[in-house]
Amino acid sequence: MALQLLKDGKTFAEINSDEPKICFLHGWGRSSNDFIKILNKFESIAIDLPGFGKSEEPENSMNPKEYAEYLTNLIPDTVEVLVGHSFGGKIAVHMSFIKKYEKLLLIGAPLIRNNRQANFNFRLNIYKFLNNLNLISEKSKEKFKNKYGSEDYKNATGIMRDTLVKTVNDDLSELLPKVNTKIELIWGENDTVIPLSIAEEA
């Protein structure tokens, strides 16, 4: 099995069936390779999301809903189950409002914003405001990134950094009660990035 280029000519995926029933969506900074060990156990497809793995970056920054719209038109109509890890879980929830699926399996997905994310977003908005006024030195910019930025934020650049900010700001708390698709949650009890309390509240 090898990566195949999908019909958009930009996005790659691991596909082991002409009519895959399960679509795997990886987390931020990851790739379809995360699912290689289980891919062959199912009729499935695992996407390298735009901007990750072998897939090209999007032309403009995207939020999870825009990823969902893009992918819904890209994956085979035979897909019945979406498996989303972290960032991929957010995308899966949005996809369920575009097309009917039998089940969403969400693994450590940041469905609602926690206090740490909210605090970071508040600081980031102030930082952007001051930066637009040219009131922040290069040294201060670097200090801000090192102090408040997550590893994902530090590693992302350009379009993908803007995409990350949009992803963090995407709060699904109002959407979740409206989901008509069966959802199963898988969480790590000791997950410190997306704590178990997020799953309990969702």
Residue ranges with predicted function:
Residues T192-I198:
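Conserved alpha/beta-hydrolase "acid-adjacent" motif
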Residues A46-V83:
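Active-site loop/oxyanion-hole signature of alpha/beta-hydrolase fold enzymes
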Residues H26-W28, F52, E80, G84-G89, ...:
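Conserved alpha/beta-hydrolase "nucleophile elbow" surrounding the catalytic nucleophile
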Residues Q117-A118, K128-T181:
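Conserved alpha/beta-hydrolase catalytic His-Asp/Glu region
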Residues K90-L135:
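Flexible "cap/lid" loop of the alpha/beta hydrolase fold
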Residues I15-K54:
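Conserved HGGG/HGGXW glycine-rich cap/lid loop of the alpha/beta-hydrolase fold
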Residues K178-V179, L185-W187, D191:
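Short beta-strand/loop motif that positions the catalytic acidic residue
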Residues L5-N16:
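A short loop-to-beta-strand scaffold at the N-terminal edge of the catalytic core in hydrolase folds
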